[in-house]
Amino acid sequence: MKDFFRRAPLPFTSSRREQQIPDNVWAKCANCGELTYQKQFNDALKVCPKCSYHSRISSREWIEVLADADSFVEYDADLQGIDILGFVSPKDNYEAKLAATSERTGTNDVVMSGSASIEGLPFEIAACNFEFMGGSMGSVFGEKVARAVERAADRGVPVLTINASGGARMHEGIFALMQMAKVSVALTRLARVRQPHISLLVDPCYGGVSASYASVADIILAEPGANIGFAGRRVIEQTIRQKLPPNFQTAEFFLEHGMIDAVVPRSDMRATIGRLLRLYQRPTSSADHREHVVAGHQ
């Protein structure tokens, strides 16, 4: 009996149930570290239920969040970048990097573009995926956005751009920089047919994108906490040798200084853009006009 109580403890082994828990059950907030069931996290559009941090989502996910079901028709999906400069780097080969990134993300470049609708209201959309080479703007990026704007002008509908970028793609040099002008020129044609450009700035939006077409819009929206600017915070502080305010280059800072029109939570984005599209709809008759005016006063 004495030896019975002195037995060595049995080695601990994890249960069969614990071994079968898949990796994607939990999602961890990148801001506060809160753990949330992945399904609950996805249902909340990847916004943390504790701190309301908006995690980055892909261009495809943005379209699923905003567009009516089965309304999105993609254009120019076959456009692919090429190494037009023969870019040489000791770290990577541009063509190989493009191929590897395409395989990982399932897209040929940063932008996914096409036609869609919100609440039955048609528009053109060009959405950026930051996961593709940091959302960098190259020839394919600019061409797809410009074509989306031109389709909007041809159809007489608004265009929505969702902008997340680190700036121009260094691998394409001047060909990347010229996309800033190309898209901005396309937007002048949209303005001539009196259709709006709605720009949504999401984290992060920097460089040539924020310095060109993303800021040339009739309505500029941003997500809470999105980092927006031209040069990064560290670069500016090193240049001016001063510390910047804690909220510098955030969406809230831009709103406070009149540089954007609204900061909109992701859960309200579809409804907000739907209201803007209705606002810009042209009444087709006097009866429609009266209905529009009455609805506006309700």
From Swiss-Prot:
Residues 25-295 form the CoA carboxyltransferase N-terminal domain. Keywords: ATP-binding, Cytoplasm, Fatty acid biosynthesis, Fatty acid metabolism, Lipid biosynthesis, Lipid metabolism, Metal-binding, Nucleotide-binding, Transferase, Zinc, Zinc-finger. Binds 1 zinc ion per subunit. One of its GO terms (molecular function) is acetyl-CoA carboxylase activity. Zn(2+) binds at C29, C32, C48, C51. Pathway: Lipid metabolism; malonyl-CoA biosynthesis; malonyl-CoA from acetyl-CoA: step 1/1. It comes from the Bacteria. It holds the Pfam family Zn_ribbon_ACC. InterPro entries: AcCoA_carboxyl_beta, Acetyl_CoA_COase_Trfase_b_su, ClpP/crotonase-like_dom_sf, COA_CT_N, Znf-ACC. One of its GO terms (biological process) is malonyl-CoA biosynthetic process. Its main location: cytoplasm. A zinc finger (C4-type) spans 29-51. One of its GO terms (cellular component) is acetyl-CoA carboxylase complex. It catalyses: N(6)-carboxybiotinyl-L-lysyl-[protein] + acetyl-CoA = N(6)-biotinyl-L-lysyl-[protein] + malonyl-CoA. Component of the acetyl coenzyme A carboxylase (ACC) complex. Biotin carboxylase (BC) catalyzes the carboxylation of biotin on its carrier protein (BCCP) and then the CO(2) group is transferred by the transcarboxylase to acetyl-CoA to form malonyl-CoA. Acetyl-CoA carboxylase is a heterohexamer composed of biotin carboxyl carrier protein (AccB), biotin carboxylase (AccC) and two subunits each of ACCase subunit alpha (AccA) and ACCase subunit beta (AccD). This is Acetyl-coenzyme A carboxylase carboxyl transferase subunit beta. It comes from Herpetosiphon aurantiacus (strain ATCC 23779 / DSM 785 / 114-95).
